[in-house]
Amino acid sequence: MKKTTLLNSEISRVTSQMGHTDGLTISDAGPPIPQESERIDLALKEGVPAFMETLETVLSELQVEAVVLTTETREVSPQTYHKIVDLLKQYNPDIQITEIDHESFKKEVSNTKAVVRTGECTPFSNIILKSGVVF
């Protein structure tokens, strides 16, 4: 059995296959997931698993150099936005954070390796993680 925090085999597979700058989306419970994107559905019920819990677990496994958030996250769900930024800075103080509007974000999702759907129901709890290198 794996000793690291992340036990989900699908997420582990995707993160292990990611190269530099490849993207992984973590979303709330209601995202439109493009047909061409791999869907990793973790949602069990409202709030389970939580977005922040899922993000923290993935960050423990994946080297992330940049992220994409929506301006709507900051405007509509500011508490969540600040929790996300604080957590990201714990893992990488130099992380690059880009904000784009939600419609542009949905288009960008189709360029990521997979979409991890959580049970989160806080509006605009979505992020694209861009893989970094460990050297």
From Swiss-Prot:
Single GO cellular component term: cytosol
Gene Ontology annotations of biological process type: D-ribose catabolic process
EC number(s) reported in the record: 5.4.99.62
Active-site residues, as the UniProt record annotates them: 20
Catalysis: reaction(s): beta-D-ribopyranose = beta-D-ribofuranose
GO molecular-function term, one example from the UniProt record: intramolecular lyase activity
Subcellular location: Cytoplasm
Binding site for substrate: 28, 102, 124-126
InterPro entries in the cross-refs: D-ribose_pyranase, RbsD-like_sf, RbsD_FucU
Coiled-coil residue windows: none
Domain of life: Bacteria
Pathway field: Carbohydrate metabolism; D-ribose degradation; D-ribose 5-phosphate from beta-D-ribopyranose: step 1/2
UniProt keywords, alphabetically: Carbohydrate metabolism, Cytoplasm, Isomerase
NCBIfam families membership: PRK11797.1
Function: Catalyzes the interconversion of beta-pyran and beta-furan forms of D-ribose.
Record text on subunit structure and interactions: Homodecamer.
Similarity comment: Belongs to the RbsD / FucU family. RbsD subfamily.
Protein name: D-ribose pyranase
Organism: Natranaerobius thermophilus (strain ATCC BAA-1301 / DSM 18059 / JW/NM-WN-LF)
Organism ancestry: Bacteria, Bacillati, Bacillota, Clostridia, Natranaerobiales
Gene name of the record: rbsD
